Amino acid sequence: TIPESSYGEFKNAPLTFIKNRFSPYQMVRENEDQKFDSFEVYFNTDNGYVAAKYDEEGDLLSTFQRFNDVKLPEKAKEKIMQKMGGDTQILSAKMTAVSDGWKITKEIYRVDVRSNGQTEKVKLIKEGDRYSL
């Protein structure tokens, strides 16, 4: 579990946090008598988690991230406003992301919005620099 004092850093840039604060190579050294092809490490907070998969040498293979109550990137907000109209209010957002090594390949946002007095859920997908609803 990530300490509360480090939570903001982890939530804002989870892969950077993991890269700077976790040594998979130490784990490999400490378990060199074990036979394994890969291993997973889970980084948890009250608001979400990252599951990181490493190979037998300690190199990052992939991650799966899920966070609640995230702040949407500006481009994501703009895409929602374009689609739903200017009176749209963003109520909350959840984010799921996957990476190939250290590179995020896909982000999925599930957003609760209020527009024209109605509350609805919007799914927004980011692949590369492109957002789609």
Predicted stretch roles:
Residues 51-62, 119-133:
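A short, surface-exposed beta-strand/turn
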Residues 10-52, 98-123:
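Exposed beta-strand-loop-beta-strand "reactive/processing" segments of non-cytosolic proteins
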Residues 1-12:
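The feature marks either
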Residues 9, 86-87, 118, 129:
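Intrinsically disordered, low-complexity regions
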Residues 76-80, 89-90, 101-103, 124-131:
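Low-complexity, flexible helical/coil segments
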